[in-house]
Amino acid sequence: MKRKLKVAIIGSGNIGTDLMIKILRHGEHIEMGAMVGIDAASDGLQRAARLGVVTTHEGVEGLSRMPVFADIDIVFDATSASAHTRNDAFLRAIKPGIRFVDLTPAAIGPYCIPVVNGERHLDAPNVNMVTCGGQATIPMVAAVSRVARVRYAEIVASISSRSAGPGTRANIDEFTETTSRAIEVVGGAAVGKAIIVLNPAEPPLIMRDTVYTLSEFVDERQIEESVTRMAEAVQTYVPGYRLKQRVQFDRIDADGPIRIPGISDRMVGLKTSIYLEIEGAAHYLPAYAGNLDIMTSAAKVTAEGVANRLLANKK
């Protein structure tokens, strides 16, 4: 029987619950050890208990007192940016070697986008999964930047209001700041900007994302091929990730430059527009919540890589 490492999830909201179900159903190198929350009546904790997962409603303090904590190697944090800073410090003081996969915008550790730089950070004590919008769009920015120098990249992430729980809503400012920075650090853009839209439409609409880049002039076919390959790579762990239409191009020359406030009044180059749609696997919330699915899928595949590395080192 294949050995698996035990994990704990902090945060029993939409993201934590969806992640728990993914691990229970599809964990390869990891298995559930504990589900941690602060509300005993939350659906996530109650569902975890029904599924046979050990739970606590006393936060990380409760987790540290649980017998299973001694066997926990990896902790997922699906709370908030401010809470994650405290959670990491508290648990690391007790267990210095513990690994964190951070699903908040706290960004204590390096940004991790599995298809772009996931292999690079398997030994990091704490990795940050950026944001749902970042997981969806940064691969596309990286796809452009690997064939052309990107001077500016802007992403717009539109998610169903119903899929945004209290944690997501509390992190809106951190969402834009963390995603913008990761567009630059991981995506390779000189300057990045992120916008999030909570769409109140009923019935809820599927997650849609738009990526704009302004790069040096190159053969458009190179960018289109790079984008297609990157989308296929993301689909290996998020099957519902897809290009909504063909990549669009606009050549902006010196006769008609564009102004980007705070960047330049006369920018020229190749404008690339990429339109994405992310359909969720409906493990917890319905398929419209692609924002949950891409975040939890990216976190799971990252933790699987970390666990595989740890298991190999223990042999």
From Swiss-Prot:
SMART domains: Semialdhyde_dh (SM00859). NAD(+) binds at S12, G13, N14, I15, S163, A164, G165, P166, G167, T168, R169, A170, N171, N291. Keywords: Aromatic hydrocarbons catabolism, NAD, Oxidoreductase. It catalyses: acetaldehyde + NAD(+) + CoA = acetyl-CoA + NADH + H(+). GO terms for biological process: catabolic process. One of its GO terms (molecular function) is NAD binding. It holds the Pfam family Semialdhyde_dh. SUPFAM superfamilies: Glyceraldehyde-3-phosphate dehydrogenase-like, C-terminal domain, NAD(P)-binding Rossmann-fold domains. It comes from the Bacteria. The active site is at C132. Its EC number is 1.2.1.10. Gene3D superfamilies: Dihydrodipicolinate Reductase, domain 2, NAD(P)-binding Rossmann-like Domain. Belongs to the acetaldehyde dehydrogenase family. This is Acetaldehyde dehydrogenase 1. The lineage of its organism: Bacteria, Pseudomonadati, Pseudomonadota, Betaproteobacteria, Burkholderiales.
